[in-house]
C-alpha cells in the first residue's frame, strides 16, 4: 500500500486480520450535507431541488389577496457574502451569516375581466428583490458561529410520521384486557387515533381530545350505514327454505368454528355433531357430499346482524345493522307467499376471528347523517362555540384534507403505504407530493380495517423503538421548519396588505416585512434546545458532539416521560447507533452517538453498509440498508471465515436474522458486515481492547476521552486502534493540503505550497497559502494552537497533513500521554482509585495544559453620565496601575495575579446634587475624583496568568483611544505585510513558471531582444518580472500562456488591493455594539496549569481517579535498570470493574516501548540500514496482523521512520479485530522482556525488593477537564443574600461553606455551645453582631457579642403575614 507523507513518518503496526472493505466515511457529513441541502447556495436558482429553503418558499408562495385581484409570486432566492469571516465574527461577538435576498413578483389582476386565466386579465407585473434577513452559514467543520460562540445543532431522533398500531399491554383496564389502538401521525397537523375500549367498541380521538365513536368519523367522510357495513364485513346470504332457513356453504368460513347444530347431508348422514369443531376433514366430507347450502335452525340466526334494510311493499320491516331476534323471524314468516321474502343477507361474524366491532359501534352511535357527525366533531374540537354545519365542515376539512394545515410528508406517506401494504413510488414532483401529503377517505378506512384485523388476531402491532419507526431530523430540516414558521407569519401580514396593493401603488418591498422570518431563524439558532454550545475540549469532543443524536428537544421526548424501553439498546441499533456511548445519569439512552459507518437516507432513516452475498459468495458490492430494508435479510458477521475466492467456508455461519443471532447454511446468507467496528461509535472505536472491557466501564471510557484536556506537547498513543488518524483528519483541527505540491516556504504561522503542474488551473501562479491558528481560546477555555509538521522542500499530496492542531501528533489524535505505570498498592496513596504520581511527570511537563480565559470590560452610558476607560482611577496606588498603559488597558505580556487591575474604568456617582457654584469650581479646577467610583476590570479570584491579547471595540461615532489605534495600526501593518509577502510568493512562482515556459524557446522580440534569440534559464536569472513578461515568443501557445500569467498577476494585484481596502474599512469603521455600550475591551489571559493533587485523571477503559500525592522521583519504585515508575495504580481497581483491557494495554504498551528502545539502541550504535530494515520487518510482518510493505520506503524514509519510533512503536489493535494474547507475548519476547509482562521492582525509599513481581507497562493516561484549580475555593468575608442576610454559596458567588442541619447536630451532640452560637449568629446572619465582631477583632479584644439572627426576623415577618401577631419580650 502507498503511505501518505505523514503516515510513512510513523507507521502504526496493525493487528487487523480482516481486509479493509471500505474506508470510514467523512465523519461530519450528517451536519455538512444536511445544511448544504437546505441552503443549496452553490446551485443555480433554476437547478435547485425542492428541499430546504426552496421548498419552504414554494410551499408558502404564491400568496393571493382575499379579493383575488393581486398575487405575490416567488421567483428565486440568492445568498450574499458574509460581512465578516469566521475569525472576525468570533472576536466581535457577531453571527457568521449571509444576507438573503428573494426575487418576488407582484401580479395585479383586472377585477372586471371575466376570464381569470387569460393574459388580458393581468394588469400589472412588478418584480423586485426583497431582503429577507440574515441566514447563518455553516463553517467548513459543521458548526455555526452565533453571537461570537461556536454552536452545534444536534440531530434529533423522533418518531417518524406514518401510521402506528400498538396496544396498552393490558394496563388501561382493570380486567387486564389488551386494548389495541392505531395512530396516524402527520409531519405537521392533527393526530388521529383509533382505539378499542373494554366493551370492544371502536373510538376515535383527534389531537388526544375527548373520544368520539369511530363511526362518527366514518359518517363525517360521507359514508352511510350500509356503505360502512359493506366496507368492513363479508355477507352471508340467508334463504327461506321449505321448513328451515338455509345458508351458503363456504368452506373457509367454517374452518375452526364450533358447530352450533348438527350438520346433516341431504342423505341424512350427520357429518358434524353439535359442539364439535369443524376441521378440514369434515369440510372435505361436506364437499364430497355435494352440498352447497346448509339448513340452519332459527336459533342460529338470533343475535346475528342484518347487512341491509328489509323492505316489503315499500315499507321498511328492519333496518341494516339490526340484531335478528325471534320476533323478527316470526314477522318474516308471517308474510303471504306472494310478498314473502325469499332471501336476505346477514353480516359474517364470529367469536374467533371476525368480531362485529364496527357494527356494534354503529349501533351505539346516535348520529345518523353526515351533518350531525360533523357537528359532533366540532363540539369536541371547539367546546363552547355554537356549531353550524358550514363551520363544522370547514374545520373537519382543514384538519385532515387541507395541504396548508396537514402534511403527512413524503416520509409519512411512504411509511403509511408500506404499513398498509399499498404501493409507494418515490417522486420529486412537488405537486404529486403535495397531493399525497393529505389523508383520503380510503386512508382512514384502511387504517380502521388494519386495526380490526389486528384485533381479530391477524397482524402484528408495531415496535415504536424500531429504527424503522424513528427517523433523524438534521440541521437542515429543523432550520427549514423554523423558516417556514416565520414565512407563515409573513404570509398572514402580507394577505392583509395585498388587497390595497394596487390602490396604494405598493411594491413587493413595501408588502413584505421580513422581521418574523429573521426572528424565527435567530430564535432557532440562538435558543433552541438542540442548538448547543459546542463541546470544544479536544478534537474528539467536537466530532462526537456533531455526530450526536438526541431524542429530546421540541417534538421529541422529555426526560421524565421516557421509559425504560426507549432508552434500551434495540437490535436495529446494530451499525446505526452506538450501544456503548451515551451519558450516565438522567439522559442515559436518550442521547446517543452515530455508529462509525452510519448515515441517513433521503427519508431520514439511519442506514448501515453491508457487503452483498450471492449464493454463499461475498461480493464487493456495498449496500446501505435502513432498518426497514433490513427486515428479512440474513447478515453474517464481518469475521466469518471466507475462502480466497470469496465463498463463506463454514458449514453453518453465525448470522443475524430478524434481530436474533442464529446459525444458518451459507446459501441462505444475503449480506455480511463490512467491518467489526461498524457497531460502535467513533469514541468507543478509540478504545483498544474494547472487547475485553465491561460495557459500563467502556461507556465511561468513551465519555471521559471527550473530557481530556489537550496537553502542552501532544503524545500519540503507543497502543491505539487505527481510528486516531480518521478523527484527527475529519475534526478540522489540522491543516490539510487541498492540492499536492512542494513546500515552498514555512514558518510558525503559515505554510506556502507550490502546487503540482497537473493540479493547477490555467493561468494561475499555482500557490496555496495556509495560515495557522495560534494560541486562541476554545469554548471550554482550552488552547487551540497549530504546529507545522512539514519542512521546506517536502513533496506532499492532496489530503496530507501540514500542521497538527490541539491534541494531534503527526496527524493522529493524541488526547493524553504514554506513562510508565505499575499495578501495586503503595502506602495507601492509591486507596479508592487514587493515583500516585512521580514528580518526574510534573518536571517533564507531561500533563501541563494551557488555558485561556477571556475577560470583558464594558463601558456603558449610565443615567448619570458615561463610564470611562482610563488609567486615572481614584484612591488606587501607583503599584496597582503599573501594568496599565496611558489608556488604562493592560500591556500584552504582563504577568497578573488575582485582584490586579486589567482595565481601569470609572463610573459616575450620583449621590450629591451640586450647586451651580460648585459645578463652576469643578469645571475650572477639574476636581473629578470625588464624583466617580472605581469599577475596573480585575483578575478574578483564584486566577493568575499572562496577558496574551487585548481587543478594543469602539462604538461607531465615538473617538478611538490610543490603544485602539495602536492595535488597529499593528493589525493593518501585519495584514499589509502578509499581502505583500503573498504577492511576492506569487510573483516568484510566476517567474519560475515563465522561466520553464521560455527555456529553449525562440523569441520574435520584446524586452530589447533580437528576433530569433533562443532563451536559456541562465540568461533569465537576472531579468525582472516586467522584462520577462515583455518577451514575445515565436510559439503562439507559449505566448498565450504568458499572457494568461500576466493577466493573472494583474488580477492578483487588484485582488490584494481590494482585500486590503476591505480590511482597512472593517478595522477603521466603528463597531456595531449593543445599545448604550460605548466601548468593549476584551483581555485574554493564558494560564499554564501543571498537574497537582486533586486533578482528575483517567485511562481509556473507564479507569478514573484523582491524583492523591506527587512523590519525589527517588521515592518511587524502580526496576533492575533503575527506571522509575511514573504512576502507581491500585490493582484492586481491575477485578471488580471487569475492564481487563487496561491490563492488556499495559503489556502491549511495554512491548511497544521496549521495541522502541531497541531501535534507539541500533540508531545510537549506527547499525547498518539493512539490519534496521530486518528488525522493522520482524516487528511489522512477523507477529501477525496487516503486512507493511517496507520495500516501498527509501533508505531516507526508513531512517526517518526509525527516528520517530525511538520513543516506542505505535500499535493499532482495532475494536473486535485486535491483538491476541499470544501476539502480545511474542512482541514482549521480541523486545527482550519476560513473556508474563511482569518485573521485579525495588522500593525507592529503602532500596528493598518488593515481595512479588509487579505488572509494569505503558498506559495512555488522560488529564480530564475537572481541575482542582477550578474547584478549590475559600472565603473570608463576601457577599450576603438580600433577605436572609446569610452568606451566599458556591464558588461563582464567592460563597461560604454551608453549616447544615447535620453539622449542627454534631455540635449539639458534643455540647459545644459557644461554637454553636457563633455558627448560628456572627458567622451567619446576625448583621449587628458581625460588625461588632469585626470591630472587636480589629481592637484585639477576644469576646463575642451576638445579636438577633436576621433569619429569625424573617420568620417573625412570615408569621405576621399569616395574620398571627408575634412579639419578642426582652427578659433583661
Curated annotation (Swiss-Prot):
GO aspect biological process, one term: DNA-templated transcription
Catalysed reactions listed for this entry: RNA(n) + a ribonucleoside 5'-triphosphate = RNA(n+1) + diphosphate
Pfam families: RNA_pol_Rpb2_1 (PF04563), RNA_pol_Rpb2_2 (PF04561), RNA_pol_Rpb2_3 (PF04565), RNA_pol_Rpb2_45 (PF10385), RNA_pol_Rpb2_6 (PF00562), RNA_pol_Rpb2_7 (PF04560)
CDD domains assigned to the protein according to its UniProt record, in alphabetical order: RNA_pol_B_RPB2
EC code(s) of this entry: 2.7.7.6
Keywords tagged on the record: DNA-directed RNA polymerase, Nucleotidyltransferase, Transcription, Transferase
GO MF, any single term: ribonucleoside binding
Stored PROSITE patterns: RNA_POL_BETA (PS01166)
Cited Gene3D superfamilies: 2.40.50.100, 2.40.50.150, 3.90.1100.10, DNA-directed RNA polymerase, beta subunit, external 1 domain (2.30.150.10), DNA-directed RNA polymerase, subunit 2, domain 6 (2.40.270.10), RNA polymerase alpha subunit dimerisation domain (3.90.1800.10), RNA polymerase Rpb2, domain 2 (3.90.1110.10)
Ranges in coiled-coil conformation: none
InterPro entries named among the record's database cross-references: DNA-dir_RNA_pol_bsu_ext_1_sf, DNA-dir_RNA_pol_bsu_external_1, DNA-dir_RNA_pol_su2, DNA-dir_RNAP_su2_dom, DNA-dir_RNAP_su2_hyb_sf, RNA_pol_bsu_bac, RNA_pol_bsu_CS, RNA_pol_bsu_protrusion
GO cellular component, one term: DNA-directed RNA polymerase complex
Lineage top rank: taxon: Bacteria
NCBIfam families: PRK00405.1 (NF001616), rpoB (TIGR02013)
Subunit note: The RNAP catalytic core consists of 2 alpha, 1 beta, 1 beta' and 1 omega subunit. When a sigma factor is associated with the core the holoenzyme is formed, which can initiate transcription.
Family assignment from sequence similarity: Belongs to the RNA polymerase beta chain family.
Function: DNA-dependent RNA polymerase catalyzes the transcription of DNA into RNA using the four ribonucleoside triphosphates as substrates.
Protein name according to UniProt: DNA-directed RNA polymerase subunit beta
Organism: Psychrobacter cryohalolentis (strain ATCC BAA-1226 / DSM 17306 / VKM B-2378 / K5)
Lineage of the species this protein comes from: Bacteria, Pseudomonadati, Pseudomonadota, Gammaproteobacteria, Moraxellales
Amino acid at each position: 500500500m502507498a503511505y501518505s507523507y505523514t503516515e510513512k513518518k510513523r507507521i502504526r503496526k496493525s493487528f487487523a486480520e480482516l481486509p479493509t472493505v471500505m474506508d470510514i466515511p467523512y465523519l461530519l457529513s450528517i451536519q455538512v450535507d444536511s445544511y448544504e441541502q437546505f441552503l443549496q447556495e452553490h446551485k443555480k436558482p433554476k437547478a435547485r431541488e425542492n428541499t430546504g429553503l426552496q421548498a419552504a418558499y414554494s410551499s408558502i408562495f404564491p400568496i393571493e389577496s382575499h379579493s383575488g385581484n393581486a398575487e405575490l409570486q416567488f421567483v428565486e432566492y440568492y445568498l450574499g457574502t458574509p460581512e465578516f469571516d469566521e475569525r472576525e465574527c468570533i472576536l466581535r461577538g457577531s453571527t457568521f451569516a449571509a444576507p438573503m435576498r428573494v426575487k418576488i413578483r407582484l401580479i395585479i389582476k383586472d377585477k372586471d375581466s371575466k376570464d381569470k386565466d387569460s393574459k388580458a386579465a393581468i394588469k400589472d407585473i412588478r418584480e423586485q428583490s426583497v431582503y429577507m434577513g440574515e441566514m447563518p452559514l455553516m463553517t467548513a467543520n459543521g458548526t455555526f458561529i452565533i453571537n461570537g460562540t461556536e454552536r452545534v445543532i444536534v440531530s434529533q431522533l423522533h418518531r417518524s410520521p406514518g401510521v402506528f398500531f400498538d396496544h396498552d399491554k393490558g394496563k388501561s383496564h382493570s380486567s387486564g384486557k389488551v386494548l389495541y389502538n392505531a395512530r396516524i401521525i402527520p409531519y405537521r397537523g392533527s393526530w388521529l387515533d383509533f382505539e378499542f375500549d373494554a366493551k370492544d367498541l371502536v373510538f376515535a380521538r383527534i389531537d388526544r381530545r375527548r373520544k368520539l365513536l369511530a363511526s362518527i368519523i366514518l359518517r363525517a367522510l360521507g359514508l352511510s350505514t350500509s356503505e360502512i357495513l359493506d366496507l368492513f364485513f363479508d355477507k352471508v346470504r340467508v334463504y327461506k327454505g321449505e321448513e328451515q332457513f338455509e345458508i351458503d356453504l363456504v368452506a373457509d368460513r367454517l374452518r375452526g368454528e364450533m358447530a352450533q347444530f348438527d350438520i346433516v347431508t341431504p342423505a341424512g348422514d350427520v357429518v358434524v355433531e353439535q359442539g364439535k369443531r369443524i376441521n378440514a376433514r369434515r369440510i372435505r366430507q361436506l364437499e364430497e357430499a355435494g352440498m352447497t347450502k346448509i339448513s340452519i335452525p332459527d336459533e342460529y340466526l338470533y343475535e346475528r346482524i342484518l347487512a341491509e334494510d328489509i323492505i316489503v311493499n315499500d315499507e321498511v320491516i328492519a333496518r341494516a345493522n339490526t340484531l335478528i331476534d325471534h320476533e323478527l323471524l316470526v314477522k318474516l314468516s308471517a308474510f303471504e307467499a306472494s310478498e314473502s321474502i325469499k332471501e336476505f343477507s346477514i353480516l359474517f361474524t364470529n367469536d374467533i376471528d371476525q368480531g362485529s366491532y364496527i357494527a356494534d359501534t354503529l349501533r351505539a352511535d346516535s348520529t345518523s347523517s353526515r351533518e350531525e357527525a360533523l357537528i359532533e366533531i366540532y363540539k369536541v374540537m371547539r367546546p363552547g362555540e355554537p356549531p353550524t354545519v358550514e363551520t363544522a365542515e370547514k374545520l373537519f376539512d382543514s384538519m385532515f384534507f387541507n395541504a396548508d394545515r396537514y402534511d403527512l410528508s413524503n416520509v409519512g406517506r411512504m411509511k403509511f403505504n408500506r404499513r398498509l401494504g399499498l404501493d409507494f413510488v418515490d417522486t420529486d414532483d412537488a405537486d404529486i407530493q403535495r397531493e399525497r401529503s393529505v389523508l383520503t377517505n380510503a386512508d382512514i378506512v384502511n387504517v380502521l380495517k388494519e386495526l380490526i384485523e389486528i384485533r381479530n388476531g391477524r397482524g402484528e402491532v408495531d415496535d415504536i423503538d424500531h429504527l424503522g419507526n424513528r427517523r433523524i431530523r438534521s440541521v437542515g430540516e429543523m432550520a427549514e421548519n423554523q423558516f417556514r414558521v416565520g414565512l407563515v407569519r409573513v404570509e398572514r401580514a402580507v394577505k392583509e396588505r395585498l388587497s390595497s396593493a394596487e390602490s396604494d401603488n405598493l411594491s413587493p418591498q413595501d408588502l413584505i416585512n421580513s422581521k418574523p422570518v429573521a426572528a424565527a431563524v435567530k430564535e432557532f439558532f440562538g435558543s433552541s434546545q438542540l442548538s448547543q454550545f459546542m463541546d470544544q475540549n479536544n478534537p474528539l469532543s467536537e466530532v462526537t458532539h456533531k455526530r450526536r443524536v438526541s431524542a429530546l428537544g421540541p417534538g421529541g421526548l422529555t426526560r421524565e416521560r421516557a421509559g425504560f424501553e426507549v432508552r434500551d439498546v434495540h437490535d436495529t441499533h446494530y451499525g446505526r447507533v452506538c450501544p456503548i456511548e451515551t451519558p450516565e445519569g438522567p439522559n442515559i439512552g436518550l442521547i446517543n452517538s452515530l455508529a462509525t459507518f452510519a448515515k441517513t437516507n433521503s427519508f431520514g432513516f439511519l442506514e448501515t453498509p453491508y457487503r452483498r452475498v450471492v449464493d454463499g459468495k461475498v461480493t464487493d458490492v456495498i449496500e446501505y440498508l435502513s432498518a426497514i430494508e433490513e427486515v428479512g435479510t440474513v447478515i453474517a458477521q464481518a469475521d466469518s471465515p471466507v475462502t480466497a475466492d470469496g465463498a463463506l467456508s463454514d458449514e453453518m455461519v453465525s448470522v443475524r436474522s430478524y434481530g436474533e443471532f442464529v446459525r444458518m447454511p451459507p446459501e441462505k446468507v444475503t449480506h455480511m458486515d463490512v467491518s467489526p467496528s461498524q457497531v460502535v461509535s467513533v469514541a468507543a472505536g478509540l478504545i483498544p481492547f474494547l472487547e475485553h472491557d465491561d460495557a459500563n466501564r467502556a461507556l465511561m471510557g468513551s465519555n471521559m476521552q471527550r473530557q481530556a484536556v489537550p496537553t502542552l506537547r501532544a503524545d500519540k498513543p503507543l497502543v491505539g486502534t487505527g481510528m486516531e488518524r480518521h478523527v484527527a483528519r475529519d475534526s478540522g483541527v489540522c491543516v490539510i493540503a487541498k492540492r499536492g505540491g512542494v513546500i515552498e516556504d514555512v514558518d510558525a504561522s503559515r505554510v506556502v505550497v507550490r502546487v503540482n503542474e497537473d493540479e493547477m488551473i490555467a493561468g494561475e501562479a499555482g500557490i496555496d497559502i495556509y495560515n495557522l491558528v495560534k494560541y486562541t481560546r476554545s469554548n471550554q477555555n482550552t488552547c487551540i494552537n497549530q504546529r507545522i509538521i512539514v519542512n521546506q522542500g517536502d513533496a506532499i499530496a492532496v489530503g496530507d497533513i501540514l500542521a497538527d492542531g490541539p491534541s494531534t501528533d503527526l496527524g493522529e489524535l493524541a488526547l493524553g500521554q504514554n506513562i510508565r505505570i505499575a499495578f501495586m498498592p503503595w502506602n495507601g496513596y492509591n486507596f479508592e482509585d487514587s493515583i500516585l504520581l512521580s514528580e518526574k511527570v510534573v518536571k517533564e511537563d507531561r500533563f501541563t495544559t494551557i488555558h485561556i480565559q477571556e475577560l470583558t470590560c464594558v463601558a456603558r452610558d449610565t443615567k448619570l453620565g458615561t463610564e470611562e476607560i482610563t488609567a486615572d482611577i481614584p484612591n488606587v496606588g501607583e503599584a496597582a496601575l503599573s501594568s496599565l498603559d496611558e489608556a488604562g488597558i493592560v500591556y500584552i505580556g504582563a504577568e497578573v495575579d488575582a485582584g490586579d487591575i486589567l482595565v481601569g474604568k470609572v463610573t459616575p456617582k450620583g449621590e450629591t446634587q451640586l450647586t451651580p457654584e460648585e459645578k463652576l469650581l469643578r469645571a475650572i479646577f477639574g476636581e473629578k475624583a470625588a464624583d466617580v467610583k472605581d469599577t475596573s476590570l480585575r483578575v478574578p479570584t483564584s486566577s493568575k496568568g499572562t496577558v496574551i491579547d487585548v481587543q478594543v471595540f469602539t462604538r461607531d461615532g465615538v473617538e478611538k483611544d490610543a490603544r485602539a489605534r495602536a492595535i488597529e495600526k499593528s493589525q493593518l501593518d501585519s495584514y499589509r505585510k502578509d499581502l505583500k509577502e503573498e504577492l511576492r510568493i506569487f510573483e516568484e512562482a510566476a517567474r519560475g513558471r515563465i522561466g520553464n515556459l521560455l527555456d529553449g524557446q525562440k523569441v520574435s522580440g520584446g524586452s530589447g531582444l533580437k528576433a530569433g534569440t533562443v532563451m536559456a534559464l541562465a540568461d533569465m536569472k537576472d531579468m525582472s518580472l516586467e522584462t520577462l513578461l515583455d518577451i514575445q515568443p515565436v510559439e503562439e501557445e507559449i505566448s498565450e500562456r504568458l499572457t494568461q500569467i500576466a493577466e493573472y498577476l494583474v488580477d492578483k494585484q487588484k485582488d490584494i488591493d481590494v482585500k486590503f481596502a476591505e480590511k482597512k474599512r472593517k478595522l477603521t469603521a466603528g463597531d456595531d455594539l449593543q445599545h448604550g455600550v460605548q466601548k468593549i475591551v476584551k483581555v485574554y489571559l493564558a494560564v499554564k496549569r501543571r498537574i497537582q493533587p486533586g486533578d482528575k485523571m483517567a485511562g481509556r477503559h473507564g479507569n478514573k481517579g484523582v491524583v492523591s500525592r506527587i512523590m519525589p522521583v527517588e521515592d518511587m519504585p524502580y526496576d533492575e535498570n533503575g527506571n522509575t515508575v511514573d504512576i502507581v495504580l491500585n490493582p484492586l481497581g481491575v477485578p471488580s470493574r471487569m475492564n481487563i483491557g487496561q491490563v492488556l494495554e499495559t503489556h502491549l504498551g511495554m512491548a511497544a516501548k521496549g521495541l522502541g528502545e531497541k531501535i534507539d539502541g541500533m540508531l545510537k550504535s549506527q547499525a547498518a540500514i539493512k539490519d534496521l530494515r530486518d528488525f522493522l520487518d520482524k516487528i511489522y510482518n512477523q507477529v501477525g496482523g496487516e503486512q507493511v510493505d517496507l520495500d516501498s520506503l527509501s533508505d531516507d524514509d526508513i531512517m526517518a521512520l526509525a527516528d520517530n519510533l525511538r520513543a516506542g512503536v505505535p500499535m493499532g489493535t482495532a475494536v473486535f479485530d485486535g491483538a491476541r494474547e499470544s501476539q502480545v507475548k511474542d512482541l514482549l519476547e521480541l523486545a527482550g522482556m519476560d513473556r508474563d509482562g511482569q518485573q521485579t521492582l525495588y522500593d525507592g525509599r529503602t532500596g528493598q525488593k518488593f515481595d512479588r513481581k509487579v505488572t509494569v507497562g505503558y498506559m495512555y493516561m488522560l488529564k480530564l477537564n475537572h481541575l482542582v484549580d477550578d474547584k478549590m475555593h475559600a472565603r473570608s468575608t463576601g457577599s450576603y443574600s438580600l433577605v436572609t442576610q446569610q452568606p451566599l454559596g458556591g464558588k461563582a458567588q464567592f460563597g461560604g461553606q454551608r453549616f447544615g442541619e447535620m453539622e449542627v447536630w454534631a455540635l449539639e451532640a458534643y455540647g459545644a455551645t459557644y461554637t454553636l452560637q457563633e455558627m448560628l449568629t456572627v458567622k451567619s446572619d446576625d448583621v449587628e453582631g458581625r460588625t461588632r465582631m469585626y470591630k472587636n477583632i480589629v481592637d484585639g479584644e477576644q469576646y463575642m457579642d451576638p445579636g438577633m439572627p436576621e433569619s429569625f426576623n424573617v420568620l417573625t415577618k412570615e408569621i405576621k403575614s399569616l395574620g398571627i401577631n408575634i412579639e419578642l419580650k426582652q427578659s433583661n
